[in-house]
């Protein structure tokens, strides 16, 4: 075992006062030579995603002690994307990724911890933990809180997205208030993160693929006993990783990121994975660009039939073999790097050795590579004069991948949603929601409320929506987010005028404002940088520090 970092606070006569304080929190004579392991506990009653995390933290604490480590629990915050969606509060969602990462780094480095076991549930918890691990590079493992089980109504599976879409269905007269209430009461039946292949489940799958959480753990249901057992085993593995000196940057290689992108394409994951993986790679010092997602998309098919665009939820994926089954298919197809290491000290090829080469015959969630849902990945990178740094479109299930239409321009999500619910957005329109980027929002809000309302209105295949903000993992339709440069820093999206012709072409990866160059130059010269919406507080600080979405929207990189 390498020398323990914690010896800086536990060894020598000069550290007697330090030991005195540690004795007050449970250390005994024999404990000062053991590795100190931080357990970053995201427990919160704010959201069902995190409500079960304390039980996992306590199991991990006990397992750490039994394995020969000394656990120290500390709390991290969360912001519920689903609850804050469509409000000013959503501006704090992406910001919380940085706050959580900063908190984990601060606690672990401030207390000279030897390793960290991070437990999270809601969307930003996962990338935040990875950012912190990449910054510190001390042995670490991530424990996902688990997915929620599907709600049931009339024999159909429900997720929280069902409730968002029901709002649009009500406004278009397709359902009444009693039916809306029935969906509301049944959509979220218990603890766990939103149940489709939305952002939380996408990022947990990516972390499992990159080897920083245990096999099968990313698709377990939050309320099933195996979830707590996995938390305990994760603690044991972390103690072993400290002894073997296995560190995050040993695992977060270029090949590991390519594997994560491949799995995300195969399962039909969230657009937010682009932003988060770019941020983690940048922090880890791994060269990765938005163009790499397009390169991998071209060769990796979508083989999982999962919500929001498909039929099944994440517990169904787990029962069909989980992420290891998906990885085995990709590995056998030459689409995965099998030599990447995991926190257990094994290679991916070794981890997958006993996984069947074909998915179970009695399920329809995972398809063989020979019969994919879509021949290419679903996260397309679009470029053009509207997005010189790139934009991201989720095109799985899209019946209209190409649309040229008049721009309907909105300066905020609220303006856009009001127009949709007032039936002021029509088939063929290209909805533009701007000044919602990392700087302009600030915070790059997710546009689930407008997109769900569009679907609920029956316009999901007839309207395109583009934004310098983000989209929820629960979004589907012809939607293009992460448009960069954003409006607030002079991006072309800020020059669009009502009625301009815009082409969104997911097949040719094109996002184009069809206005002649002379007129665009005139508009550019007349453009005035908008005043910051916030000058002080967390959002003011974030807006001053944050990078472009094309670079992961991080706050600690030059």
Swiss-Prot record:
Pathway: Amino-acid biosynthesis; L-isoleucine biosynthesis; L-isoleucine from 2-oxobutanoate: step 3/4; Amino-acid biosynthesis; L-valine biosynthesis; L-valine from pyruvate: step 3/4. The keyword Iron applies. Keywords: 2Fe-2S, Amino-acid biosynthesis, Branched-chain amino acid biosynthesis, Iron, Iron-sulfur, Lyase, Magnesium, Metal-binding. Its EC number is 4.2.1.9. Binds 1 [2Fe-2S] cluster per subunit. This cluster acts as a Lewis acid cofactor. It catalyses: (2R)-2,3-dihydroxy-3-methylbutanoate = 3-methyl-2-oxobutanoate + H2O; (2R,3R)-2,3-dihydroxy-3-methylpentanoate = (S)-3-methyl-2-oxopentanoate + H2O. The modification N6-carboxylysine is found at residue 124. GO terms for biological process: isoleucine biosynthetic process; L-valine biosynthetic process. GO terms for molecular function: 2 iron, 2 sulfur cluster binding; dihydroxy-acid dehydratase activity; magnesium ion binding. [2Fe-2S] cluster binds at residues 49, 122, 194. Pfam families: ILV_EDD_C, ILVD_EDD_N. The active site is at 472 (proton acceptor). Mg(2+) binds at residues 81, 123-124, 446. Its cofactor is [2Fe-2S] cluster; Mg(2+). Functions in the biosynthesis of branched-chain amino acids. Catalyzes the dehydration of (2R,3R)-2,3-dihydroxy-3-methylpentanoate (2,3-dihydroxy-3-methylvalerate) into 2-oxo-3-methylpentanoate (2-oxo-3-methylvalerate) and of (2R)-2,3-dihydroxy-3-methylbutanoate (2,3-dihydroxyisovalerate) into 2-oxo-3-methylbutanoate (2-oxoisovalerate), the penultimate precursor to L-isoleucine and L-valine, respectively. Belongs to the IlvD/Edd family. NCBIfam families: ilvD, PRK00911.1. PANTHER family: DIHYDROXY-ACID DEHYDRATASE DAD, DIHYDROXY-ACID DEHYDRATASE, MITOCHONDRIAL. Homodimer. This is Dihydroxy-acid dehydratase.
